[in-house]
Amino acid sequence: MKQCFFAVDLGATSGRTILGTFTPEGLEMEDVNRFPNHLIETGGHFYWDIYELYRHIIEGLKIVAQKKDVEITSIGIDTWGVDFVCVGKDGGFLRQPYSYRDPHTAGAPEAFFKKVARKQVYEWTGIQVMNFNSLFQLDTLRRNNDSALAAADKLLFIPDALSYMLTGEMVTEYTIASTAQLVNANTRKPEDALLRELGLTENNFGRFVYPGEKIGTLTKEVQRMTGLGDIPVIAVAGHDTASAVASVPAMNPDFAYLSSGTWSLMGVETKGPVITEETESLNFTNEGGVDGTIRLLKNICGMWLLERCRAAWGQISYPELIAEANASEPFRSLINPDDVLFANPADMEQAIQTYCSDSHQPVPQTRGQIVRCIFESLALRYRQVLDNLRTLSPHPIETLHVIGGGSRNELLNRWTANAVGIPVVAGPSEATAIGNIMIQALTAGTAKDIASMRQLINRSISLETFYPEDTDVWDTAYLHFKQVTMNH
């Protein structure tokens, strides 16, 4: 009977469940099921369908229950950050959770800073100010006299809501609460002063847990539905990026990571928060990591731009798009991927064209020109953020590890290496699921520490290294990029 770990890994556009097994050769993983995750738009708001996500998790567990040679040791859930469910006094969900893409938080930080100074909020939390942080979502709901929040007894972040559906136990996991901007970066506990401003207390949240702690076991109902026994559900790093960073296959500590998916998150691991005027002005974030680490990082708009264009273009493969981009003229048009114009436009291609027109650049017309514009702009934006990160990091940065789905994008990896001027190591692409499984394995005693797990991943997975080329050309392009994005 193989000892296996069941990982639930949910992103903003898709989800999957995965079985991970440790063998003498390393880590083996197999997909159980994959499924889309859609935004639902109704009544002028955007929601997630948490019941549909739960149904897919149950389906995955049913599939595994039918495998005769597999015994699940534990289950772990990670998801995207900041969104949450309002739970009533009777334990039921009061409505589907709002999505962070919902427009109702426009201007929300400024409204909150009238009550608590921006500087004070950053000193407590060390978290990058973004409209959709849970802190601002909650304050928006409160200002709007939202009926679900008014009736809520508990608030559960998405991974904690799903573990509650499986176990009946309500917890608040540290990494997901940290990215919400509700945790004090130094004490690593919820910041009471912020909760008070929201009309909340710690009693409105589940039991506070850290990665590696047990949440509970599958309820009798879930056991009956799936055919499984009383399997424990473990709090992994509930925030997908924290799980992904745990899996970085680094052999020495002098690295930066780029978790590349719908969002790109670039940062370094530190032993404690770095909260200074400089990190605040550059809007860097200090998010909770595994094993007592802090992830000093910045959010960058990632493959979202291409995902939205691709959805509009219909059936076209990535290899086709990349070939078209490769054949297009270099550095013809550049954009700031983080411009508010690209947050959630009705037509992403049109938004890119508008940006280029407004900044007096050639307007991309073909698919290849659009994709080339996105990739070159991302690579140059990565350089800009890495330059800032070097000044903030307590250690030198000699290598950039690209992990997550974007690590499979060979063209973008090559251009990123050219832009940043240091080697780029690509992989693993399933970083989040691997980190999720790693934390479960550490809890089960299968491995002794994070460092040895990283070495094991380095041995188990084929990694590709990209070395910088054409750096003079990219240096010139970077100056142009800074000029274009500064003036827009």
Give names to the regions the model predicted.
Residues M1-R95, E123, Q223-V233, V420-I422, ...:
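N-terminal glycine/serine-rich phosphate-binding loop of ATP-dependent small-molecule kinases
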Residues A7, T21, F113-T125, N131, ...:
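Active-site core segments that coordinate phosphate-bearing ligands/cofactors
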Residues T42, K62, K67-S99, Q128-F132, ...:
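Short beta-strand-loop/turn "lid" adjacent to the catalytic site in phosphate-handling enzymes
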Residues H56, G60-K68, C373, S377, ...:
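Stable alpha-helical structural segments in soluble proteins, enriched in small hydrophobic residues
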Residues V70, G92, N203, P253, ...:
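Structured loop/turn residues at beta-strand edges in well-structured enzyme cores
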Residues V70-T79, K154, R207, L392-G404:
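Short glycine-rich phosphate-binding loop at a beta-alpha junction
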Residues D78-V82, P211-G212, S260-W263, T399-S407:
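Glycine-rich beta-strand-to-loop/alpha-helix junction loops that act as flexible
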Residues D102:
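Carbohydrate-associated surface elements
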